[in-house]
């Protein structure tokens, strides 16, 4: 039975198989359909291949000196090389003939590549995953329209897809194997199609299914006491509280995963606790039999068959979750998306416990806060009140779903996949270079550019000079306009045609070349050859404008769903564009060169310095500049109020100053904009302050919205503590108002309160990231191999204390602690881990002098600009009158 529908590709893989003795490779695409059911596509018709060229050839001498017959005779090569035309090599900038070489299957590519390199050929396009190859060659993204034959239709499949043939399990399994599949996959539908049955579809919000789970485990012996899973299917949630014998718990949880068939699997800290613990316990229960372990942890979206259970080369069977070198997990066909990591990356919270993050997101909603169970005494809690512990476990499984919803994490991953034209799992869990690869390689294939292998270029390079930062004088400046370069690095790359495909590698010179201002690196003109990167960036900039226009239209028409989709897409384009410089300035990317990043920052420094010079020549004061922003004093009437006044007369003066600043900012942006350096009037400030250090300033924004702008100070550092952030913010408000005496008096009063012990300890918690390595031989956390003096580091000592209390530790997590008075005779700081959020109890007593000193040191850097340094704040006496500063 034929079937057509739109689907979103969640993940992909491939399998080698034999079709009547002929080797073939089938691509498995795990998808979620527009209508909500899951579909596995088995795609045949694409053959694995690499490309080769003879490095001795070029445009003028295209006859190869190397033997093509030897290529054909190479082990695991299928057939003769096929001419693939003339292609540009980014290795040396020469155009030469290239040939396509077909390989028996994807597992043989590495060997063929090594063999052909060994006899002199330059091998390209040889490290591209086969699923990615499919998307590249067919110019597909994650959203596709497919046409194929239904092999299986389960209970949740559309009724019109169900026939006696498609619902017969034995018949379906046989038909799936006949086209290269592994067996009956645990999805709603399995469809077979040829590559001709796939085409790109317009983006749509796929109705993904997400499963969140949590475990409660014994402190004494690590056994699993209970578990909970919550499945979110199109907004409808189903709860699965699970208890019983440990084996039963694991089997039931696996049964839920395989029957509910989620695309995303989440939880809080599942990467570092729940998944490793399940792996550990399943191996403990069935140490010698992978087949016995499969019902305990067979979460992969593949058949529970012998071929999928048995170990591969250096990897477990595909049915089992697998931990990668970067500590992330893969579950074949599904996407593990840890809510802890998403919250950490998006919110950058001072503390990272689930309870703290929940209160951060929903401060006034007690229902959203974690229940009070002492996790450090879980064995006692389980023995005394198992029902409450199970309820606690269920709540811990619900909250990650709420966190992902609040952060729009899944929608943003899908939008990024749509923009970068990758499968959703690549957008969700992979690196920026993989996203950019997807765009650059398909354009390179179209433009006749050979695709080098990763790591082929130089591995080491000197540090690239950063952007220009203008010196800033200490003090307050009234009425300042901020000009930003629009998409500065992308604009420079576009206007100067910067790309590895346009870099002039010899000593030739031409008037048409773009020449970098410092090192005189040359790039050929757009007329001679438009670089891959400028082409892509221009396309992305245009597409972002289209999405933003569509967003505005949807908002006008009240179409919330369309507005949400377009907003996610334009944001994804922004993320992708901002990633280009970092990738192309790196020393690992396949299309990079050491000159590229240096050229970009050269032009950036040149552009901003030239504009500063012109502005100052006109008599305007440049207060500050930083990489892509310029702060200029606006010519407003002297004595204009810096804060919005309440009186009508002063309000008129304030409005006049605001309007004059806005007109001035617009005129500067218009006059100094040029190709590759488009200026935008970004912000108007009624007051600007810095204590004289680069990258540290504050301002009161009056346009386009009214808010406080703070950059570089402890307020924005996650290793600060709450009262310091709060007081610094209040102090800046006073300083911007001109009330410096009041700011200093307030600072002194808070220092006095700390010395008197009149501050809540929760406001003094310091959080720092802490690394560690699990020593499986000793069955304990090892910090000595990570830090030279771990016991001298307060956050390591705090981490050890939370481990000793039976609480989770995750390498890289933020560990909260309070500084206490040192023990008698001990020269080190006293440290007590902050565990109140997780297990309750009385907070530790803090070291009053330490915190008074820390506050004085941080705030003194600011008030020193008016004659009040750290020592004077602690003493309560000032050096000089403040009036001279204003």
What annotation goes with each model-predicted range?
Residues 1-79, 184-269, 280, 285, ...:
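Conserved RNase H-like, two-metal-ion catalytic cores of nucleic-acid enzymes
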Residues 92-203:
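N-terminal accessory regions of nucleic-acid-interacting proteins
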Residues 196-234, 520, 528-589:
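Active-site cores of enzymes that catalyze phosphoryl transfer or operate on phosphate-rich substrates
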Residues 261, 265, 275, 284, ...:
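Active-site-proximal helix-loop-helix substrate-binding element of RNase H-like nuclease domains
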Residues 366, 607-627, 632:
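Active-site palm subdomain of RNA-directed nucleic acid polymerases
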Residues 630-662:
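Catalytic palm subdomain of template-directed nucleic-acid polymerases
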Residues 662-886:
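C-terminal, non-catalytic extensions of nucleic-acid polymerases
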């Amino acid at each position: 039975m034929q079937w057509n529908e739109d689907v979103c590709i969640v993940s992909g893989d491939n399998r080698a198989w034999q079709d009547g003795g002929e080797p073939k490779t089938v691509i498995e695409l795990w998808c979620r359909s527009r209508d909500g059911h899951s579909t596995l596509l088995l795609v045949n018709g694409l053959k694995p291949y690499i490309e080769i060229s003879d490095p001795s050839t070029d445009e003028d001498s295209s006859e190869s000196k190397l033997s093509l017959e030897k290529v054909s005779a190479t082990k695991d090569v299928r057939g003769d090389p096929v001419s693939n035309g003339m292609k540009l090599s980014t290795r040396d900038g020469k155009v030469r003939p290239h040939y396509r070489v077909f390989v028996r299957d994807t597992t043989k590519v590495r060997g063929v590549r090594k063999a052909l390199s060994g006899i002199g050929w330059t091998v390209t396009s040889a490290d591209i995953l086969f699923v990615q190859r499919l998307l590249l060659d067919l110019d597909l993204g994650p959203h596709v329209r497919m046409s194929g034959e239904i092999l299986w239709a389960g209970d949740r499949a559309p009724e019109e897809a169900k026939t006696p043939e498609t619902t017969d399990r034995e018949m379906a399994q046989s038909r799936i194997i006949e086209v290269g599949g592994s067996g009956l996959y645990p999805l709603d539908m399995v469809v077979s199609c040829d590559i001709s049955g796939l085409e790109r579809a317009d983006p749509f919000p796929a109705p993904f299914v997400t499963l969140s789970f949590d475990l409660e485990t014994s402190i004494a012996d690590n056994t699993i006491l209970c578990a909970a899973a919550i499945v979110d299917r199109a907004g409808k949630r189903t709860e699965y509280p699970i208890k019983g014998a440990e084996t039963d718990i694991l089997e039931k949880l696996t049964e839920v995963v395989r029957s509910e068939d989620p695309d995303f699997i989440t939880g809080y800290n599942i990467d570092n606790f729940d998944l490793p613990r399940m792996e550990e316990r399943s191996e403990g229960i069935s140490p010698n039999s992978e087949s016995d372990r499969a019902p305990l942890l067979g979460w992969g979206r593949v058949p529970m068959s012998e071929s999928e259970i048995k170990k591969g080369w250096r990897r477990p069977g595909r049915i089992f979750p697998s931990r990668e070198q970067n500590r992330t997990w893969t579950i074949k066909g599904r996407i593990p998306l840890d809510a802890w990591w998403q919250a950490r990356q998006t919110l950058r919270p001072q503390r990272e416990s689930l309870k703290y993050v929940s209160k951060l997101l929903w401060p006034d909603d007690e229902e959203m806060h974690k229940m009070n169970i002492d996790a450090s005494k879980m064995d006692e809690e389980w023995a005394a009140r198992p029902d409450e512990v199970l309820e606690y476990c269920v709540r811990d499984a619900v909250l990650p779903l709420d966190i992902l919803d609040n952060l729009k994490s899944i929608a943003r991953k899908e939008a990024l996949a749509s923009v970068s034209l990758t499968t959703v799992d690549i957008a969700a869990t992979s690196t920026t270079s993989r996203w950019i690869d997807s765009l650059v390689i398909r354009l390179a294939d179209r433009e006749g550019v050979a695709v080098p292998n990763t790591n082929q270029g130089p591995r080491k390079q000197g540090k690239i000079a950063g952007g220009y930062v203008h010196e800033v004088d200490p003090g307050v400046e009234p009425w300042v306009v901020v000009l930003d370069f629009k998409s500065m690095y992308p604009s420079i790359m576009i206007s100067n045609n910067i790309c590895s495909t346009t870099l002039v590698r010899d000593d030739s010179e031409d008037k048409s070349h773009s020449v970098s201002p410092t090192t005189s690196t040359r790039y050929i003109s757009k007329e001679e050859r438009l670089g891959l990167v400028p082409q892509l960036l221009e396309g992305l900039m245009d597409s972002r404008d289209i999405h933003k226009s569509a967003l505005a239209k949807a908002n006008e028409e009240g179409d919330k769903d369309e507005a949400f989709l377009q907003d996610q897409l334009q944001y994804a384009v922004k993320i992708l564009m901002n990633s280009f410089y970092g990738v192309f300035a790196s020393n690992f990317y396949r299309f990079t060169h050491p000159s590229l990043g240096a050229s970009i920052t050269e032009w950036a420094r040149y552009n901003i310095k030239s504009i500063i010079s012109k502005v100052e020549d006109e008599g305007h004061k440049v207060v500050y500049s930083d990489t892509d922003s310029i702060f200029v004093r606006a010519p407003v009437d002297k004595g204009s109020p810096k804060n919005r006044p309440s009186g009508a007369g002063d309000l008129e003066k304030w409005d006049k100053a605001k309007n004059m600043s806005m007109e001035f900012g617009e005129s500067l942006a218009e006059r100094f904009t040029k190709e590759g350096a488009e200026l935008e009037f970004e912000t108007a400030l009624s007051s600007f302050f810095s204590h004289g250090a680069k990258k540290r300033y504050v301002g009161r924004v009056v346009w386009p919205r009214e808010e406080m702008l703070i950059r570089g100070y402890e307020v924005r550092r996650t290793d600060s503590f709450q009262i310091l952030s709060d007081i610094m913010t209040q102090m800046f408000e006073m300083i911007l108002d001109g009330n410096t005496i009041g700011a200093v008096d307030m600072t002194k009063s808070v220092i006095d309160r700390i010395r008197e012990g009149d501050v809540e300890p929760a406001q003094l918690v310091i959080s720092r990231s802490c690394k560690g390595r699990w020593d499986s031989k000793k069955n304990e956390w090892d910090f000595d191999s990570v830090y030279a003096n771990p016991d001298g580091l307060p956050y390591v000592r705090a981490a050890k204390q939370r481990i000793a209390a039976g609480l989770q530790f995750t390498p890289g997590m933020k560990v909260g602690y309070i500084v206490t008075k040192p023990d008698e005779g001990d020269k080190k700081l006293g440290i007590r881990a902050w565990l109140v959020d997780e297990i309750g109890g009385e907070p530790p007593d803090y070291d009053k002098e330490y915190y008074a000193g820390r506050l004085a040191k941080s705030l003194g850097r600011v008030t020193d600009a008016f004659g009040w340094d750290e020592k004077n704040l602690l003493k309560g006496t000032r050096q000089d009158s403040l009036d001279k500063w204003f």
